[in-house]
Amino acid sequence: MIDGVEESDAPLSPKSPFARRNGRSLRIQRLVDCQHFHYTTVELGPVKVVIIAINTDENATERIKMRVESESNSWLVERSREDWAVFDRQLHRCVFERRHSRLDELFPLIHLESAKFEEVLVKYTERLSELTGSIITCYPVLKFLEIDSRGGHFEPAEETSINVPAIAAAVVTKDFEPTDNSQLRLRVGDIVSITEMSTASPNEQTFWKAKLTISNQKIVDPQNGHLGFEIGYFPRDCVMLIDDKRLPNPLNTEPKPAPRNARRYMTTMFRNRRREPIFGLELTELFMRTGKRVPVIVERCCAAIEDQGIVTGIYRQCGIQSNIQRLRAKFDSGAEPDLHEFGQRDIYSVSSLLKQYFRQLPNPLFTYQAYPALIETFEKEESVEEKVESLRFLLEAMPEHLSRLCKSKSLTDMTSKNLAIVWSPNLFRPPPTLNGADAHLLSGLNVHTAICDFCIENSDSLFICDIDEEQSKCTSIENSFTTISKSATMSDMRSESDSRWPRFFRGKSVEGFWKFNRKQQTSTGELCGSPPSEVKWRSRSTRSHSTDATFQSSRADSFMQLMHTGMDQIREGMRIFRARARSMRPTSRPPPSPRTRRARFSNGGGANNVQRVNERERDIQIELPLATAESSITPEPRSTMDSNNIMTRTVSVNDSDDASFEENGLKEIRERKVMFKAATQEHVAPIHERSSPVEEWSSDSRESLHLEMSRYDNVSPSGTITRSQREPISNLSPAAQLLFFESSRASQLFSA
C-alpha cells in the first residue's frame, strides 16, 4: 500500500502531487489544481449526508441540495446528477468495492424522474453515512462532500465567497439582526464589501450579499481559532455606499457648472500635445515643418561652440551622458535650452549633442544619392584647384563651423585631420546594401576622412557664400597676433581680474600673471615681433591674447595648487624652493667638483693643503661694462639693453686641471658655462610656446625666461669661452687679463 492505495501497474496521475514530487518539477502545486491524489493520513469521524431537496434554478438546471454533518458542524452543498454519478465511480475506484459497499451504481439512473431519483439518493446517502470514516483518503471524494483531511469544512478557493471580488463598499448606518443562517449581523459603523447587488423592487425588500470587512466585534472561528470573516445577506437600506453620488448636501445647493472656455481648452490641448522628436528625422521633413534650411539645434550648438568651445579636445572628448540626454529631451519637446549658459559648465556635452544629431539622421548630410558621385570626384587624379571646382558643384551647403575651429587649433589641439576623423562617420555613410551586410561600412573610412579633411582645409574656396570675418568669433592665430573677444574664453576673464593679494603669494608665476595687463599696454611689437636682437637659439611663434592668459594663469594655478596640498608636500616644495633660490643667486658659488674634493684630501688632508686648495679654488667675480664685455666675449646684441647692465662671470681654477690641459708648456683654458644677467629688470621676456599648458612651478629668486630650464641652459652659444677664443682674450689689456686669471697663471699663459 502506498498512501492508502493499492499498488498497481498504472502510473500515478500527472495531476497528483506525489507524481510531481517524484518527478523533476519542484514547483509547489495548489490543491485546487490537483485532480486526484490521496492524503497520507486522514482524521475523520462519522460523516452524515442528508438529501434535502431537488431544486431547479433559473436556467432549468436541477441542483440537488444536501446537508453534510461532520465534527459537530454542518453545511449545505449543491450538486448535479452528473456530479453524483462521477462521485459514485470515484468512490468505488479508490475506496470501496461495490460488492462490499452494496451501493447502487448511479450512472445508469441519472435519467430517472426527479422523484424517483430523489428516492434513490436518500437510500444511497443513508448507506454512505454508515461507511464513512478515516478509510476515505481520496481527495476527489472528500472534495465532493467539502471535507478536509481533519473532518472540517473545506471549500475550494474558486468556490469560496471570501475570494469573490467586491463590486462596492458601504458603511452600516442601521443595526440589523439576522433571522436566518444566511443573513449577516450588522452594527452601526461596520464596513462591508458588497459582492452581489440585486435590483430594487417596489413592493419587496431588497437584500444584498456582502463580506463583513471591518467590524466592531472581532469574529473568531471556533474551529481553527483564527480571525474569521462573515458572509451573508442584509437589507440594502441598512447601509450607505461610500462612493454614492446621491449623498445629501448639507447646504442643499447644487454646484454651478464650471464654464468651459473652448479657446483656452484647445490651446491647452495643442500645447500639451506630444511633439514629434527632431532626432532621427529627415532634414527635408524638418524643413517642411519649420521652414528653416538650417535646423535650430545646429545653429544653437555651432554658436555656443564657436563662442565658448575654443578649448582643448573639442569634439574629441565626450560630454556627460545625463547632460546630453537632458538637452536632447528639451530639443525634442520643442524647447530651446540656453546653450550659452550651459556651455560655461559643460561645453563638451554640446559638441557631443551635435555629433549625435548628425549621426542619427536617416539620410546623412552627404546624402546616399550624392555619395557615388562624391567618391568618384574625389578619387580622380587632379590637382587641388581642379578638385575644388569639381566638388563645388556637388556640395550645395556645408557649415563653415569646422573650418573656423580648425583655425584655432593651437588652442583646441584639433587640426583639420583630427576634426575629419571625428566628423567623417557622422557626415558620410555609404548607401545600405540589399543583403543587409555591414562589411562595406569599414571600406570607405579612409576616403571619408580624406574628403572631410579636404573640405575643411579648402572651405573658403569650396563654398560661394563668404562669411564676414568681422562677425566671426574665432580668429586665426597663426599668421598674425590677434585677440579673441573678451567673453570668448575663461582665460580672458581671469586676466582682467585685478585682485590685490599679499606679496607673500606673488611668486614668479603669479607676479607675471598680475602684470599681464601692463604688458599689453607696451608696444605690441615687443611681444609679437621677432627682433633680430632676441635670443636666436629659441624658436618662438606669436600667440593670441587668450593663449598668453592661459599660460600665465596655469603657472598661477600650479602655485595655488601647491598651497592647497598636504603638509608633507608643502615641506618638500619649500625645500626645493629654498634650494633653487640659493642656487640661482648671482653671488652663490657652485658646489665643488668631485675632482676638487679629491684634490683636497689627496696630499694627506693637512691644513696647509686645504688652505692652498681653497685659495686656488676661490671664485673671481668680475663686473665689467657691457661695452667691454662685448669687445672681449661677444654675446647676442640687444637693442633695448641699458648701458648700466652688468655681466657676471665665475671661473674656478683647479691644480688638478692644469696637468690635464698642459700641452707643450701652454696652458689651455677649459670651456666654462657662463650666465649673463641684466642689472635692470625693466625688460620683460616674452612668453614662449610650450608643448604642455602646465609649466613647472618656478621660484621668485631669479629673473629669467619663463621657459623652465636649468640655470646653465639659458646661455648663448656665443657666450662660452672655447679654445678658439684664446686669441681675443690674449689681446686684452694686462689689467683685464689679471681680472680674469690669477697672476701666476696669467704670466705663464701670456708669456708662452
From Swiss-Prot:
Q: Report if keyword Oxidoreductase is assigned.
A: no
Q: Which residue ranges does the record annotate as region Disordered?
A: 523-552, 582-609
GO molecular function: any one?
GTPase activator activity
Keywords from the named record = GTPase activation, SH3 domain
A biological process term (GO) from this entry:
positive regulation of GTPase activity
Q: Which Pfam families does the entry link to? A: RhoGAP (PF00620), SH3_2 (PF07653)
Q: Specify the SH3 domain's residue ranges.
A: 165-244
Rho-GAP domain: residues covered: 281-463
According to UniProt, where does the site described as Arginine finger lie? 316
Physiological role: Functions as a GTPase-activating protein (GAP) for ced-10/RAC-1 and CDC42.
The protein's name is: GTPase-activating protein rrc-1
Q: Which gene encodes it?
A: rrc-1
